[in-house]
């Protein structure tokens, strides 16, 4: 019934959009359009993974804004609400426990969407339970959530809260087998969660992770830098407040790592420069930390090299799952690329 209701809403949304005069469509704000696209993509989750997973979306509370624009307003100091997706394999038994994957999405001002459907299918097939938070700053929920961005800050705690929600509220989740994995900005959040909450995760994978925000400001575009210096965010440039940008960079708290970690990067990455990730690797080595990493040489796909639908990308992901599986012990680990691809693409 829930699936049918979502399909009906989807059809209504598309019909309404198509029937609007061009001038009206043009007047839709960016946030209104993002909200519309989010609702459509939410329906697609049921189409893409609903055959093997129970799909749900919950509302959680994270800490208050790190900086209030109006300290005397009625909402000042209130916890911030955010959404989180939950994917549970349909094969689970209520009297058993299963490992949990915490999956922070990639992108600045982005959201968890069906770009990752094939990877969610791969995780579900191994009988992982997955939680994926649309943490503060995510798109698809209006200007309020968007403007609450806290890059490298309390967004990390939002993701950690989603972890705790699953452990505390689902008896089928094994709290001793919780892993975290993500790419790009999600890789950065993976690192920060491992560094900020040592011992709370059994292991982690960080793919092409943003690692040094100060360095990043040196090669990023002006539009990217303005996201950070905007009044609703840091409100200052890195030149004006180096300490604040340092606080948001995983490269600095590397000494706190206690849990198994795997890092992947690519020399042809056109988003997170390999030099930035190399700085993270060097910092961990300098602290004498035991971890694993691999620097791929001009792998096809650049920033997305190990998230593609190609056979080669599937091979790389199989190695990632083998690493995670060492510590999380899923019930149905993949034995081959063929098994992985059948899980992701059905054939």
Question: What are these model-derived regions, one by one?
Answer:
Residues 1-5, 9-61, 342-347:
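N-terminal targeting or regulatory segments adjacent to alpha/beta-hydrolase or S9 domains
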Residues 21, 134-135:
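Membrane-interface helix-loop junctions at the exits of transmembrane helices
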Residues 36-96:
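N-terminal cap/lid segment of alpha/beta-hydrolase-fold proteins
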Residues 60-70, 135-347:
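Active-site-proximal cap/loop segments of hydrolase catalytic domains
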Residues 80, 98-100, 129:
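Hydrophobic core residues within well-ordered beta-strands of beta-rich domains
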Residues 87, 103-104, 181, 264:
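Short hydrophobic segments within beta-strands
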Residues 95-107:
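Short beta-strand element of the alpha/beta-hydrolase
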Residues 113-133:
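Short amphipathic alpha-helix adjacent to the substrate-entry channel of hydrolases
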């Amino acid at each position: 019934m829930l699936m049918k209701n979502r399909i009906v809403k989807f059809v209504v949304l598309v019909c309404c959009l198509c029937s609007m005069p061009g001038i009206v469509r043009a007047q839709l704000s960016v946030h209104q359009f993002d909200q519309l696209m989010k609702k459509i993509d939410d329906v697609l989750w049921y189409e893409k993974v609903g055959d093997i997973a129970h799909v749900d979306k919950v509302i959680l509370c994270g800490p208050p804004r790190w900086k209030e624009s109006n300290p005397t307003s009625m909402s000042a100091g209130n916890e911030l609400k955010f959404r989180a997706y939950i994917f549970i394999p349909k094969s689970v038994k209520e009297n058993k426990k299963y490992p949990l994957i915490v999956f922070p999405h990639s992108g600045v001002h982005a959201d968890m969407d069906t770009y990752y459907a094939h990877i969610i299918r791969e995780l579900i097939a191994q009988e992982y339970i997955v939680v994926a938070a649309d943490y503060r700053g995510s798109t698809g929920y209006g200007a309020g959530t968007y403007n609450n961005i806290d890059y490298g800050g309390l967004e990390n705690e939002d993701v950690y809260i989603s972890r705790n929600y699953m452990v505390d509220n689902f008896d089928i989740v094994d709290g001793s087998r919780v892993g975290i994995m993500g790419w790009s900005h999600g890789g950065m959040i993976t690192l920060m969660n491992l560094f900020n909450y040592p011992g709370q995760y059994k292991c982690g994978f960080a793919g092409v992770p943003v690692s040094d925000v100060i360095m990043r400001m040196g090669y990023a575009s002006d539009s990217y830098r303005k996201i950070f210096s905007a009044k609703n965010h840091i409100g200052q440039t890195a030149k004006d407040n180096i300490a604040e940008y340092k606080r948001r960079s995983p490269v600095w708290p590397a000494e706190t790592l206690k849990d198994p970690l795997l890092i992947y990067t690519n020399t042809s990455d056109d988003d997170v420069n390999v030099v930035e990730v190399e700085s993270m690797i060097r910092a961990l080595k300098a602290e004498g930390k035991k971890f694993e990493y691999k620097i791929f040489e001009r792998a096809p796909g650049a920033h997305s090299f190990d998230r593609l639908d190609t056979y080669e990308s599937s091979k790389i992901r199989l190695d990632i799952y083998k690493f995670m599986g060492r510590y999380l012990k899923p019930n149905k680990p993949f034995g081959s690329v063929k098994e992985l691809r059948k899980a992701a693409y059905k054939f």
